[in-house]
UniProtKB/Swiss-Prot annotation:
One of its GO terms (molecular function) is iron ion binding. InterPro entries: Haemerythrin, Haemerythrin_Fe_BS, Hemerythrin, Hemerythrin-like, Hemerythrin-like_sf, Hemerythrin_metal-bd. It comes from the Eukaryota. Monomer. Pfam families: Hemerythrin. Muscle. NCBIfam families: hemeryth_dom (TIGR02481), Hemerythrin (TIGR00058). Keywords: Iron, Metal-binding, Muscle protein, Oxygen transport, Transport. Myohemerythrin is an oxygen-binding protein found in the retractor muscles of certain worms. The oxygen-binding site contains two iron atoms. The lineage of its organism: Eukaryota, Metazoa, Spiralia, Lophotrochozoa, Annelida. This is Myohemerythrin.
Length: 118
């Protein structure tokens, strides 16, 4: 896996070069960071909302571009949303760590494959 940034914030190493997707990735980082800072129900709900919105946009772009890896990519999104959608506040450290690691590995390991293809 890739190094998990501390403090947990988006940096240039995560750029996918699609402005909307980069901005949405920043919001997911912030959503996870806010759950670290305050693992309350409103912060968890915000994380689920911004993640769902982002996945919808990213998948629409992949569909429009007829991106070849769209099916396994959507499955990863679905699995992650099921995981975070099933959490309840307060979110424990193990699940926060899971989210932190999943996002870093997903952007750098999976999203980076669509650079220049959407």
């Amino acid at each position: 896996g890739w190094e998990i940034p501390e403090p947990y914030v988006w940096d240039e190493s995560f750029r996918v070069f699609y402005e909307q997707l980069d901005e949405e990735h920043k919001k997911i980082f912030k959503g996870i960071f806010d759950c670290i800072r305050d693992n309350s129900a409103p912060n968890l709900a915000t994380l689920v909302k911004v993640t769902t919105n982002h996945f919808t946009h990213e998948e629409a772009m992949m569909d429009a571009a007829k991106y070849s890896e769209v099916v396994p990519h959507k499955k990863m999104h679905k699995d992650f949303l099921e995981k975070i959608g099933g959490l309840s506040a307060p979110v424990d450290a193990k699940n926060v760590d899971y989210c932190k690691e999943w996002l870093v590995n997903h952007i750098k390991g999976t999203d980076f494959k669509y650079k220049g293809k959407l």
